[in-house]
Amino acid sequence: MYACINLHFTDFCNFQCKHCFVNKENYELSFDELKQVVDKIYKYFNDNQINGRINLAGGEPLMSRNIGKLINYISSKDIEVSIITNGYYLTEQFLEKHKRQISIIGISVDSLEHQTNLEIGRCCKSNTLSKKQLLHICYKIKALGIKLKINTCLSKLNVNENFNDFINEVKPYRYKILQMHCDNENKINMVTATEAKIFLSKINYDYIYESAEEMKSSYIIIDSKGNISTDNLHSSKISIFDYELNDAINMLNINYQNYIKRYVLNE
C-alpha cells in the first residue's frame, strides 16, 4: 500500500499568491514538534505496512531554518521525502546536499510572464522567477536524478497562457494542473469548468487535472499547528499531538476514491 502525508509545517512564504489557502498567522512547527510528527507518521506507516512519503510544503518550506534537519530526520526513518516549492530559494548547494534524500521536487509554475506573476502574487516584492531561471532549476533537478514535477494552479489570470513550450522543454515526470479554489475575495478569479476544459484541450503533454471538487476531502494534511485535515480549508481541529495518526485519520471523512486515484493509481 502507498500513502502520502502532506506536511504543511510552515505558513511563512516570500510570495503572496491570491489563491493560497495557507493561514496568514505565520505559524511554524518547531523542530521538536516536527520530530514528534515524523515519529507518529513513521508509526502509522509501519503499523499499516505502508510504503509512505512525506511531502513537505508550506508556505514556502525552503524558508525554514529547519528544512535541512527535517529532511535528515525523515530520511533517517527510511521515509521517502518530496518537496513542493515556488523555487525562489532553491539553490544548487541545497540540491547537491540533499539529492540522495529527496525523491521528488514539485515546482509551482503558474505563469511564465512577469506581469502575470505580479498579478497572481507570485513575486518577492517586485521580483519574479524568469523562464530562464525556471529552466535552469528544472534542468539541475533532473541532472541530479531527482524526479521533477510541475504544478500549475489554473485561474482567470493565467487561463489564456500557453505552457506547452516550457513543459515540453523540461519534460517533468508529472505535470499537474489544479483548478483554483478559494473562499476569500479572490474567488472571482476561479475558472469555470468550461474555461478549464478549453485550457486543457490545448495542452500537448501528458497531464493530471484536479478540479476543485476532486480536491475536496482527498488529502491528508498536517498544518503548521499540527492540525490534521482532508483538504486545503484547514477546518479540522484534530491535533496530531492528541491522537495517534491512525486514530486521527479514522476521524476524518476522507474521499478515499480520489485519494487512491491521486497517490496510488498515478504513482
Where are these regions (language model features)?
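Acidic (Asp/Glu)-rich catalytic clusters
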Residues: 42-46, 97-101, 167-171
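Short, glycine/charged-enriched secondary-structure capping and boundary segments
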Residues: 69-72, 96-99, 120-122, 163-166
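N-terminal [4Fe-4S]-dependent radical SAM core
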Residues: 1-6, 43-49, 217-219, 254-257, ...
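A cross-family glycoside hydrolase active-site/sugar-binding cleft signature
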Residues: 6-8, 55-57, 82-86, 106-110, ...
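Conserved alpha-helical substructure of the radical SAM core
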Residues: 1-82, 90-96
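Radical SAM enzyme [4Fe-4S]-AdoMet core and its adjacent flexible, acidic
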Residues: 29, 114-229, 233-251, 259-266
